[in-house]
Amino acid sequence: FKERLIYRPLETLKLTGRVGYYFRERNKPGDTQDRYRGFSGGMKANYTFNIMSNLEVGYTFDQYDKSDYQSLYKNDVRDYSNVQHNVHALYNYTFNGKHTLTVGADYLRDYLMSYQFTDNADHTMHTADAFGQFDWNPTERLNVIAGLRFDYFSDSNVRHLSPHLGMMYKIGNCSLRGSYSQGFRSPTLKEMYMVF
């Protein structure tokens, strides 16, 4: 099932909550069944300070498990579990009705236990990022976007700074675009530790 609830305690504040649950069972030869469970939930708050600025903060939780249920012994043995906690914040401010500053940050805690790991081991990693972007419109024809992002990846103690610059110039019905950027993507726990 999936449910979503929206509540507005103030004209300037919107709260959103969601929850979901999933269960499936599959019979196997003998007295064992595969069981699959998923649970997810989250909360988000949007606050509008004024016509120029707003803030969004949120938290999400996601868990997916697989287990072998031995009906003879009524034993439920979990052999796979993935649990994620995610927190994010995003702030926007508009200058003169046409230039926008955006800043934000994210944090993720990822836990994974799997039968595909050596000795059914488990691993945990933390990733975090902070970013800022300025959308500048000096004329009706010219748009410039400049941004900077910082990423942290706990498993390798990696820190990475990624710049971005983009420009667009309109000539009649045509638009000329150019951009430069760098990026970073941390590997997942599955990519790092699973033995296939």
Indicate where each model-derived feature is located:
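Flexible loop and strand-edge segments within Gram-negative outer membrane beta-barrel domains
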Residues: 1-84
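Residues on the lipid-exposed face of transmembrane beta-strands in outer-membrane beta-barrel proteins
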Residues: 3-7, 43-47, 89-93, 130-136, ...
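Amphipathic, soluble alpha/beta structural segments
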Residues: 74, 80-94, 100-104
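Outer-membrane beta-barrel channels and translocator barrels
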Residues: 8-12, 48-52, 94-98, 108, ...
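A short acidic, helix-capping loop that chelates divalent metal ions and anchors anionic groups
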Residues: 26-27, 112-114
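Surface-exposed extracellular loop regions of Gram-negative outer-membrane beta-barrel proteins
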Residues: 2, 12-20, 55-69, 100-109, 111, 154-156, 160, ...
